[in-house]
Curated annotation (Swiss-Prot):
Cited function: IGF-binding proteins prolong the half-life of the IGFs and have been shown to either inhibit or stimulate the growth promoting effects of the IGFs on cell culture. They alter the interaction of IGFs with their cell surface receptors.
GO CC aspect terms: extracellular region
GO MF, one annotated term: insulin-like growth factor I binding
Keyword Secreted carried by entry: yes
Domain Thyroglobulin type-1: 184-266
PANTHER family xref list: INSULIN-LIKE GROWTH FACTOR BINDING PROTEIN, INSULIN-LIKE GROWTH FACTOR-BINDING PROTEIN 2
Protein name as catalogued: Insulin-like growth factor-binding protein 2
InterPro entries: Growth_fac_rcpt_cys_sf, IGFBP-2, IGFBP-like, IGFBP_1-6_chordata, Insulin_GF-bd_Cys-rich_CS, Thyroglobulin_1, Thyroglobulin_1_sf
Source species, domain of life: Eukaryota
Composition bias, Low complexity: 136-145
Length: 284
């Protein structure tokens, strides 16, 4: 449970607005050159608030409002809000990856300020590992402070937390041996592999923990376990991640579809089996 909260905190950091607590990872500044690559027209319809694209993107997108769905691949929540998994979710980290979170009012007071709780565990403090959410090009976006390297005490606490999480996982596996589970889809299996890699990462180093997440491709699965037509890499170095179109069943790229930093309009390159049968029936 502790490791899950630690990893959940890392993803929450990508999805939320900044907090005054010490930041372990900061996005690079949005230079004029990077901002010049953004689309010229403002998002439509008009937004109540503009925020940076997911990850470390620099282009403006409409912020998600309270009650709207959110996740790793969606736009961020508006100021004063945070993307939370649904209460009681058994897999909160996976829920955020799948975009099944909900924008809600910040609940930082539940944890207390960092000044009042200087001895809190890393998984508790990870709730404040935030990446700037505002659309600005100055130091407020990137910050000038270098990433803080965790102390030996914190590294030991992380190791203990990871071992406890592994023990809990082994215990759950033993209890579920007699239970029949539905077959996992290819997308879900790939997602499980990525989450397993994340759980085994050596997070504390000089690059900052979120750098590791950007190096991975997290499969974008829908609620039924299939691949979403559009798959995207996370934004990095102020640029939007590349997006491409895939077959929902196999996850392989659709022939003729582009790989671009934007919307590849995947509906133009894929015909569902139902649509294909309907077209055949209408043909003379």
């Amino acid at each position: 449970m502790g490791l899950s909260r630690y990893l959940l905190g890392l993803l929450l950091g990508v999805l939320c607005t900044p907090a005054p607590a010490e930041v372990l990872f900061r996005c690079p500044p949005c230079s004029p050159e990077r901002l010049a690559t953004c689309p010229g027209s403002a998002p439509r319809p008009p937004c109540a608030e503009l925020v940076r694209a997911p990850g470390c993107g620099c282009c403006p997108v409409c912020a998600r409002l309270e009650g709207e769905s959110c996740g790793v691949y969606t736009a961020r929540c508006a100021g004063g809000l945070r993307c939370y998994p649904h209460p009681g979710s058994e897999l909160p980290l996976q829920a955020l990856v799948l975009g099944l979170g909900t924008c809600g009012k910040r609940r930082d007071t539940e944890y207390g300020s960092s000044q009042e709780r200087g001895t809190e565990l890393p998984e508790e403090r990870s709730d404040n590992m935030l990446v700037d959410n505002k659309l600005e090009a100055g130091p407020a976006v990137a910050g000038e402070a270098a990433p803080r390297k965790p102390s030996k005490k914190e590294m030991k606490e992380i190791a203990v937390t990871r071992e406890r999480a592994n023990e809990q996982q082994r215990s759950k596996s033993n209890k579920s041996e007699d239970k029949k589970r539905p077959a996992r889809s290819l997308c879900q299996l790939q997602l499980d592999q990525v989450l397993e890699r994340i759980s085994g990462m050596h997070l504390p180093d000089d690059r900052g923990p979120l750098e590791h997440l950007y190096a991975l491709h997290i499969p974008n699965c829908d609620k039924n376990g299939f691949f979403n037509l559009k798959q995207c890499k996370m934004s990095v170095n102020g640029q939007r991640g590349e997006c491409w179109c895939v077959n929902p069943i196999t996850g392989k790229a659709l022939p003729g579809s582009p790989t671009i930093r934007g919307d590849p309009e995947c509906h133009l390159y894929y015909t569902s089996p139902e649509e294909g049968r309907a077209h055949t029936q209408r043909a003379p």
